[in-house]
Amino acid sequence: GTGFVLWVPDVSHVAVACTNPENMEEAVYQMEQHPQDATVWQVHIPHKMIGYSYEYIIEMSNGVLFRKSDPYAQASELRPNTKSVIAPVSKHSWSKTVLQRKKIQNKDHREKPMAIYELHIGTWKRTAQGGFLNYRELASELIPYILEMGFTHIEILPITEHPLDESWGYQTTGYFAPTSRYGTADDLKYFIAKCAENKIGLILDWIPGHFCVDEHALALFNGGPLYEEERLERRANPDWGTLNFDVQKGEVVS
């Protein structure tokens, strides 16, 4: 089966709306509060739903309804769509990559200095049709260039999900899924493995300090400040047009 669990306190009802990718029909399943923690809502659906898109329907005490993507989703729809996606279990094995990473980490960079090549995947290179390279195509295009130019490391601007193609990726909407612009999580794992195979260190930018204000994501998740700062004067990050996390809450920092 398929289980859904969501932390969302101070609301009246929660449901999960799941869309079948074959016929695009949506089914709505009501969630129940956890018997030991009323801030957590859950439901178990007795069949597999790999590939289904889904979002949560949250009802406030005043009857207002709104929809949210899953903060912990492992995959997302391709923009401009915003639903989360139930991803298949990964078939990728890290055993060989772990050994190769240790060899990279054990290098003495006093003898061979680090040379880091930083890039944004979406603007580094495009396909002949003007589209984005996927992670596998990036591996075949970028790694030979890095080796030829003598760089020791690649640093990639944020690869977590974000709404705008024009963005560098610093306005995050989901922290547990690589953006679907460039392929699947297994495609990304392939790229990481190829870097390790070629003894190239890899740095992935990750932005835990602030998050996107888009209404389908973390902002005002239960109708009020939940993931963001409750104190209005500390909530907004005007330099980025984002919201700051409330690090006073254990559920947020965990």
PLM regions with names:
Residues 7-13:
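Short proline/glycine-enriched turn/loop motifs at strand-loop junctions of beta-rich domains
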Residues 1, 25, 35-118, 123-130, ...:
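The feature marks proteins involved in alpha-glucan
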Residues 12, 27, 39, 52, ...:
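Residues that flank catalytic or metal-binding motifs in active/ligand-binding sites
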Residues 102-111, 120-254:
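Substrate-binding/active-site clefts of carbohydrate-active enzymes
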Residues 16-20:
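Conserved aromatic beta-strand anchor motif in extracellular beta-sandwich/beta-rich domains
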Residues 29-31:
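Surface-exposed extracellular loop regions of Gram-negative outer-membrane beta-barrel proteins
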